Each structure stands twice: as C-alpha cells, then as structure tokens.
Amino acid sequence: MEADDHVSLFRFPFKIPTFRGIRKGGVYLSGALYALGFWIFLDAVLYSRYSNASDVHVTFIDWIPFLCSTLGTLIVNSIEKNRLLQGALSSDGGAFGSGVGDLDSSMAWQARTVLFFGFALLAGGLSGSIVVLIIKFLVKDYNTYPTLGMGVNNVLGNVCILLSCVVLWIAQNVEDEYSYSLTL
C-alpha cells in the first residue's frame, strides 16, 4: 500500500478538495438551505392564515412532515461519524469476539441503528409532504396556484431541509490536513 492511500469507506474517482474553508462553507450552506426551507414553509403558513381566500388552510397535518424532517436532521447530524466504523476498524475486524472489539462493534451497531431512524424520519417527512400535497390539494381538485402553492411550499421546504442535512453530513465528514486523530 502506498503512503498516499488512506483507509476510507468509499472510493471516489475524483479527489475531494481538503482545504480549511470547505467545512465552514458547507456548514454555512447547510444553514442557509435549512433557513430557506423553513421560510418557504412559514410563507405558506402565513399565507394560509392571513391572505388565503379559499377554504383550505394549513393545519397540523401539514406541520407533521416538516417536524419529521427537522427531527431526522437533528438525529442524523448528532451522531459521531467515527462511531459508525468503530467495530469494522478494530484488530479483529469487528468479528464476534471478546474484549474491546465486541464493545466497539456494539457501539457501531447502535450508531447505525440511530442513523437509520434519522434517515427514515427524513424520508418520511419528504414522502409525507408529497402525500399531503396529493391528498389534500390534488385529489380534492384544488389545482389553482395560490391554494396549490401551500402544498408545493410544504414539499419544497422539506426538500430544502433534506438537502441541508446532506450538505451538513458531507461537510462534517470532509477531512482537512489540519485535523489530528488522537487515540489512546
């Protein structure tokens, strides 16, 4: 193995840039995407409350996908990324054994399970907003823009939150040359 190679989970055919500002820029972009998604959804809520002339309004049912996406984002981005590969990188390969390797493998599976629930909440939030759009607006033949726009804004807000989570996940996983890994 060459000195340039490093152990990673995925092999990309291109080199990911590793300068200092990419992590900070990714975090800022993620925050901007979340704020945009929140504002798009809040715009639909405020329009429904104060300017809507139709008989369809934003109710708690419309908030559920948004809350699921937000909770999924919090769960996914609160997991320490080094916990996911902990058991696989131990000396025994994460196999069934005794000692520290078994504990590392257990922690890795717990982290993977929580990560799965976080991504399931994100997917449920996005699919829930699409279902609300279809059932509440399209099936009941509310297909004019100001009324249909409330459902479209719900979907767009959830898409922005999902993209925010993905950008933050990538930004947190970018390794820069100035980070040090100290293990005891």
Curated annotation (Swiss-Prot):
Keyword match Lyase: no
Keyword terms of this UniProt record: Acetylation, Glycoprotein, Membrane, Mitochondrion, Phosphoprotein, Protein transport, Transmembrane, Transmembrane helix, Transport, Vacuole
Glycosylation sites recorded in the entry for this protein: 52
Protein origin, superkingdom: Eukaryota
Membrane-topology descriptor: Multi-pass membrane protein
InterPro entries, A to Z: UPF0220
Residues found modified as N-acetylmethionine: 1
Key word Phosphoprotein present: yes
Subcellular location: Vacuole membrane; Mitochondrion
Residues carrying Phosphoserine: 8
Gene Ontology annotations of biological process type: late endosome to vacuole transport via multivesicular body sorting pathway; protein targeting to vacuole
Transmembrane segments: 26-46, 56-76, 115-135, 150-170
GO cellular component, one term: fungal-type vacuole membrane
UniProt xrefs under Pfam families: UPF0220
PANTHER family: SMALL MEMBRANE PROTEIN-RELATED
Miscellaneous comment as given in the Swiss-Prot or TrEMBL entry: Present with 1900 molecules/cell in log phase SD medium.
Sequence similarity: Belongs to the UPF0220 family.
Function: Involved in vacuolar protein sorting.
Name of the protein in its database record: Vacuolar protein sorting-associated protein 68
Organism for this UniProt entry: Saccharomyces cerevisiae (strain ATCC 204508 / S288c) (Baker's yeast)
Gene behind the chain: VPS68
